[in-house]
Amino acid sequence: MKKILTLLVILNMFVSISMAAESDYRKIYLDMKVPDFSYIHGIDPGQYYDNKDASYSVYPLLRLSSPLYFKTITIKPGYYDLTPREHKGKQYILFKQNGLIVHILPVYKKEIVPIDFYRTHLPKPRYTITQKIGNSLHMFVGKVFKSAKRKPLAKTYLEVEDVADNFVILIIYYNNYRYYIIVRSVRM
């Protein structure tokens, strides 16, 4: 009987914690401010540095089929590169199209990515025989000549959670950190 009561008390604590988390979304959303800055000509100054070793954009790509809203900002349907940036000590996510910044949204939480997250969530690339031979040749050249060694690209992942009261949480994984953004699927 004591075990059952203890189990019920613990279960009740977890349920109350999850209910409190659901009700906090409105408070988090209302406490966040619309960014009051912009970049000159909509160009991200760190974009060249991030993409210099890659042949494609290293940022996670978000495809929207319906608009999202953050207070006065309307994010229209389309494709967006999501880029985390820091401005005056605060974290922001830049929504970019064609390399230009379209929207800037604040991050409400930044966490470190768990150690094995990318290994368990990202699929392993499958190579043909000729690609395997080419990769082993590149690895050999990289071992002999250190300057020719390929640098690993940024690891990225994107999660979208639809939570209570028309709130949507975007979780952007970029390298060692994950960034949380809260938006709405309907205007408030």
Annotate the PLM regions:
Residues 16-21:
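Sec/Tat signal peptide C-region and signal peptidase I cleavage site
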Residues 4-14:
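Sec-dependent N-terminal signal peptides
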Residues 22-75, 83-188:
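Extended, well-structured beta-strand/loop surface patches
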